[in-house]
Design a protein with these regions (language model features):
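C-terminal lobe/tail of nucleotide-utilizing enzymes
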Residues: 1-25, 189-276
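Walker A/P-loop phosphate-binding motif and the immediately C-terminal alpha-helix
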Residues: 31, 36-74, 189
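Short glycine/serine/threonine-rich phosphate/pyrophosphate-binding segments
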Residues: 49-55, 77-80, 151-159, 180-184
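Phosphate-binding loop that captures ATP/GTP phosphates
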Residues: 66-67, 72-117, 122, 129
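Glycine-rich phosphate-binding loops of nucleotide-dependent enzymes
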Residues: 108, 132, 151, 164, ...
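Conserved Switch II/interswitch segment of TRAFAC-class P-loop GTPases
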Residues: 142-149, 155-156, 167-188
Length: 276
């Protein structure tokens, strides 16, 4: 890179070695219309990323937006289970159609395409990444205001494919309170920065549990380190969600849309600002 580079590519010639080419995303299905794409990521598994994706879509749907969820976790899909969806996605000459939840949220997942939802998907990375890409190019996302992409944990093939192929407008990182989270979140944040994808902020899940007798907040996993991690990366903490046994029961029953929790309103506000 030239020492005189100003990083303003609009003022330099096409032959400039430091010039950043505009990202070339894959075109969506011709019948699709998606306003904003939000990636929901985590550095490790088991932090409640899929539940966060589902609750965030529900929160935006309650605000009157038409939402969709692209389940990019091909080998560990859980979105259909959370919404109680067990049907098979249908296709016609226009493309493959997602299945709508009770609230009208469009859902596409590998579990809606396989014969038996308990069958494992034993595919190598490039095939999995290709399937995720097809969920964007072949599926009809019709009149969707917010498409949430529930990504598998880590920084492997699928997140790379999503960042390169989809016009991601923002990323929400889901984390847990443990000190180890600082390194894990840093990996996710650094990948987003490398791919030049905007970060909306961090959601801390399993932040605490509320004592049913006295209402005291108990930090099951010890003191939270998310605030300092967020400050280090100049990111807002969008929400701190408790361990909620009732929410867990609703999720297991496929009734997550009936949850009345308002824990993700801050994250919903951050998403809504993208339209303004």
């Amino acid at each position: 890179m030239s020492e005189e580079c100003t990083h303003d590519c609009s003022n330099c010639g096409a032959a400039c070695s430091s010039r950043n080419a505009a990202p070339q995303h894959d075109a969506p299905n011709p019948n699709s219309s998606v306003k904003k794409v939000i990636g929901v990521v985590s550095g490790k598994g088991g932090v409640g990323k899929s539940m966060t994706s589902a609750l965030l879509a529900c929160a935006m749907a309650r605000r009157g937006y038409h939402c969709g969820i692209l389940d990019a976790d091909i080998t560990g899909p859980s979105i259909p289970k959370l919404f109680g969806i067990h049907g098979r996605a249908m296709a016609d000459d226009k493309g493959c159609w997602p299945i709508q939840s009770r609230m009208g949220i469009d859902v596409m997942s590998i579990n809606l395409l396989v014969e038996n939802e308990e069958d494992p998907v034993v595919w190598r990375g490039p095939v999995i990444a290709g399937a995720v890409k097809q969920f964007w190019t072949d599926v009809v996302w019709k009149d969707v205001d917010f498409l949430f992409v529930d990504m598998p944990p880590g920084t492997g093939d699928v997140p790379l494919t999503v960042f390169q192929s989809l016009p991601v407008d923002g990323i929400v990182v889901v984390a847990s309170p443990q000190e180890l989270v600082s390194m894990i979140v840093a990996k996710a944040v650094n990948m987003a920065e490398m791919m030049k994808v905007p970060m909306l902020g961090i959601v801390e899940n399993m932040s605490y549990i509320v004592c049913p007798d006295c209402g005291k907040h108990i930090n099951v996993f010890g003191d939270s380190h998310v605030d300092e991690v967020a400050a280090k990366h100049h990111l807002p903490v969008l929400a701190k969600c408790p361990i909620d046994p009732q929410l867990a029961a609703l999720s297991d029953a496929g009734m997550i849309e009936t949850s009345g929790g308002q824990f993700l309103e801050g994250a919903a506000d951050a998403c809504e600002k993208l339209l303004k």
